[in-house]
Amino acid sequence: MTQLAIGEATPHGATYDGHGVNFTLFSAHAERVELCVFDSRGNERRYDLPGRRGDVWHGYLAGARPGLRYGYRVHGPWQPAQGHRFNPAKLLLDPYARRVEGELKDHPLLHGGHDEPDYRDNAAVAPKSVIISDHYDWEDDAAPRTPWGKTVIYEAHVKGLTYLHPELPQEIRGTYKALGHPVMVAYFKQLGITALELLPVAQFASEPRLQRMGLTNYWGYNPMAMFALHPAWASSPETALDEFRDAVKALHRAGIEVILDIVLNHSAELDLDGPTFSLRGIDNRSYYWIRDDGDYHNWTGCGNTLNLSHPGVVEYACECLRYWVETCHVDGFRFDLASVMGRTPTFRQDAPLFAAIKACPVLSTVKLIAEPWDIGEGGYQVGNFPPPFAEWNDHFRDAARRFWLPRNLTTGEFACRFAASSDVFKRNGRTPGASVNLLTAHDGFTLRDCVCFNQKHNEANGEENRDGTNSNYSDNHGKEGLGGPLDLMERRRDSIHALLATLLLSQGTPMLLAGDEHGHSQHGNNNAYCQDNALTWLDWQQANRGLTTFTAALIRLRQQIPALTGNSWWEEGDGNVRWLNKNAQPLSADEWQNGPKLMQILLSDRFLIAINATLEVTDIVLPEGEWRAVPPFAGEDNPVITAVWQGPAHGLCVFQRG
């Protein structure tokens, strides 16, 4: 290999062209950038990047090939009070690295947030970037592009979903390969979901605190390399990218979209006591929101916050998203703590990143889902994201639980949430699909735990049960824990059925947590982010098959109801919905606000949802006509009903007009 040629300022990152590699690095405040390459024995050779265009440093290394390990040393001022922490003694990861060799260890040589610089070299323990060739034969792959009105999302963890599946080959359980295996594809199709939403698959690290406790970051919300696949779920780091793309291709052939949970709000460098391995040493002042004293704005609760209003960081974020769409053919993203994306530092709908995404012909046409909050002032922004974003709707989650698990909730509030929270989302040209309805998600109780525990039980996390929310709106039905007498277990079953029916038969985009259709429990742990064990892995052999069948039937029913699949707002008199009381009359103003939790919802003039959320058996007079219960509510003896349904306590039934 020879000395570096000047090369080009684009594309960003390290690009192999068949003859060598073009390297670029964004740093607005650097004074000099060294490219460091390593041979198989760890010997290092350094080259100055000779070119600079604007804030992008660049150079071309002829003869460099895939497999080359490299990093950067960045020279510049050490001025912590001004946010500058340049230290060429520290080897740094390329923010655009497609593959990373080595883990991020809790090691003193990786710390760089102190007042004085540490001039000890860290190359022996620092992770290294690796050049790859990302050629792949996609064959005839095509994005399913499922309309929002027909979309049913299934949130899952790559490992936890398949690690205990007895019908999968042992060697692929808990891996990317398993996601596209015919056993899993057949299950997804049988269940009826249309989109698989994966918890973070970009390479992440375990926080030093967890490492010292002997725990690991299981969920993956601690990003280390945003362009690289997490290697632990692949046969080898070298094959991770192709194995993931194989899974995407197999899912697409079955008509199933793949949505990635992505963490564009902070990095694994954490606070000033965290490791320095990339952005902090490359251009701390540009990449992060810095306070006047040089410390970080911690609007994420993770120690730092990415400055997604800086032009260079906006470009980085958009290129990351485009990489996953163009190179891996993913169909969309769920953005963790997405209010950070709109901070300028106050939240704005016209924030630079939102504008860039909307203007991008690639990103503006995929599914974009925001977790519409962060922990900073003004961070709660449910309903305020601009099109084309959809949003997680915590109003729906809390209302559904409060309605069915005895809490105070009016019929009017329940109906509003059932109708895609039009008071929140019917603005700026948005459709009902913008409301992503959920009962549960990876953080919080599972659905089964919602009906078995009144209190969180997070002792295994090592924080003396202080972590995790205390606002669960759960109900153990009289006994804390999973077991109980038969009548209690039946009440819990009825509550689960009612909650699932509410989720899957409401207007909006439903999201189902993987395992809820099995009756999966985390034994009351509502923050299992560090539990990579049987607590979080789905036990397929112990799955509640009846509940799975019930859930699949609800999804099939949903797809038959035009009022739910049309993705247009319901208007009075349009035939989509009528709200009735227990006597089949329109709900009065008093019943909306003060009546018992009894109602009927007539959808598309032929599907009737009869609801008794009270504690008493109650007769409900059905509208005129002949009605027959539909699966999963129809029993073997399913007579036509023309007058009254005897609604059991905490009961729900769906009828179709004959």
From Swiss-Prot:
It catalyses: Hydrolysis of (1->6)-alpha-D-glucosidic linkages to branches with degrees of polymerization of three or four glucose residues in limit dextrin. Coiled coil: none annotated. The record marks D443 as: Transition state stabilizer. Residues 459-483 are annotated as: Disordered. Keywords: Carbohydrate metabolism, Glycogen metabolism, Glycosidase, Hydrolase. Pathway: Glycan degradation; glycogen degradation. It comes from the Bacteria. GO terms for molecular function: glycogen debranching enzyme activity; hydrolase activity, hydrolyzing O-glycosyl compounds. Its EC number is 3.2.1.196. GO terms for biological process: glycogen catabolic process. SUPFAM superfamilies: (Trans)glycosidases (SSF51445), E set domains (SSF81296). The active site is at D336 (nucleophile), E371 (proton donor). NCBIfam families: glgX_debranch, PRK03705.1. Removes maltotriose and maltotetraose chains that are attached by 1,6-alpha-linkage to the limit dextrin main chain, generating a debranched limit dextrin. Belongs to the glycosyl hydrolase 13 family. This is Glycogen debranching enzyme. It comes from Salmonella schwarzengrund (strain CVM19633). The gene is glgX.
